[in-house]
A protein has these predicted regions:
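HotDog/MaoC-like acyl-thioester-processing domains
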Residues: 80-81, 90-136
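A short mixed-secondary-structure module that forms the rim of ligand-binding clefts
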Residues: 41-43
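Non-catalytic surface loops within mature trypsin-like serine protease
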Residues: 18-20, 77, 124-126
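Catalytic strand-loop segment that frames the active site of acyl-thioester-processing enzymes
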Residues: 2-39
Length: 136
């Protein structure tokens, strides 16, 4: 895997539905019964990671796996169903094989507030070797 491009930026928009909210994330739990119908933190993290994959995956050959190996996340403002988030992803220069660092930010299009930010390290490793080491 070689990345000679300096900084890349990717942006996408996701509309929040009831399925993305706190009561829906773990059906049958106290969280589902008492949680507010706002964008769930776990769902927002998944959206940020998905947007990142849209940027990173095209540069990574199929024989390599991309695995999260560190990160810091902040959920900074609520988002309601029907509202949209614009996700902006940035990646700095990446080594030939190893760790990549990227930052994904979600902004509530309707309120202008930052909804969340994820700073994430991703390791790019040989897929077959990884699964051998994991005993699979």
């Amino acid at each position: 895997v070689t990345n000679t491009q300096p900084v890349q930026v990717h942006a996408c928009t996701r509309t929040i539905t009831a399925a993305h909210t706190v009561p829906r994330i773990l059906p049958g739990t106290l969280l589902a019964r008492r949680g507010e119908p706002v964008l769930a933190t776990g769902t927002l993290i998944a959206m940020l990671e998905d947007a990142t994959w849209e940027l990173l995956a095209p540069d990574v050959p199929d024989e390599f796996a991309m695995l999260g190996c560190g990160g810091v996340y902040e959920h900074t403002a609520p988002t309601l169903p029907g509202q949209a988030v614009r996700i902006e992803v940035e990646r700095g220069p990446a080594p030939d094989v190893g760790r990549q660092t990227w930052t994904a930010r979600a902004f509530n299009v309707d309120t202008g507030q930052q909804a969340g930010v994820l700073h994430h390290q991703v390791a790019t490793v040989d897929r077959e070797r990884f699964y051998r080491r994991m005993g699979r």
